[in-house]
Amino acid sequence: MCAQPYRYRNMKLYTETKILLKSIPATVVTLFTVSVVCMNLLANKTLVQLDWIALDGGILISWLSFMCMDMITKHFGARASTIISIHAAVINLLTCLIFFVASAIPSRANDYTAFDSIFGGTWFVLLGSTVAFLISAVINNFSNHAIGKCFASNPDGKLAYAMRTYVSTFIGQFLDNFIFSVIVFVFFAPIFWDGFCWTVLQCATCALTGAVAELIMEILFSPIGYRITKRWKRENVGQEYFAFTERMSAQ
């Protein structure tokens, strides 16, 4: 008796995800997924490390991930954006697995130590980036949606889009940076990286500085995201997905 509802929910989620992936323009899904994978690779490099601040390479691309999530949340909803976030995280894990296998295969053709070190990665960096991304994505998506409800009189206006993207991005980026930094550089790095570590203060300042830097990028590029979502609405993008969700909610 319990297995049938569970199987039904799984089929419903599978169908919803399949329709959603067909509904969101492929360019946005591709950019989003690639940015998530790149964040994982770039996070292996510390760009700046001072007593009060530390920044890793993920800051260079993470703003794009959040901009894509904000666009999807605005047009398709927080649930849809979260589904796509999980999809991107799974692709990231599969990519990292391929990199790991490639780096683990011995080769005498040349010295691939640098390649193996970069693309082989470490399991705790993958763990930190995946956990941090999923938590921050959920909070970003649903806070974005909640803030949008405060502008019921003009939900599609520039002010509404700006406020929901700026606030949710800052919150999400701070949590993403902080959770990742604590997991990787406070807990695991001292054990596996010969004593190298960040302090909690460095993690907090990294998270704050990174959130501010990525917020600036969001401010610079949000007009593009706003125009894209306006075009999506004008061209009725995603009607199949909206029809599906309406049918499911009516059952």
How does the language model describe each region?
Residues 100-109, 182-192:
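Membrane-helix interface motif
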Residues 21-22, 114-120, 154-159, 195-200:
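Helix-boundary and loop/linker segments of multi-pass membrane transporters
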Residues 81-87, 158-167:
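Membrane-interface alpha-helices at helix entry/exit sites of multi-pass transporters
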Residues 13, 157-159, 163-164, 174-181, ...:
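Alpha-helical transmembrane segments and their cytosolic interface
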Residues 36-41, 66, 70, 92, ...:
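Transmembrane alpha-helical segments of multi-pass membrane transport proteins and ion-pumping complexes
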Residues 11-89, 93-94:
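Hydrophobic transmembrane alpha-helices
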Residues 55-60, 127-135, 167, 171, ...:
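Hydrophobic alpha-helical transmembrane segments of multi-pass membrane proteins
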Residues 101-124:
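Membrane-interface interhelical connector segments
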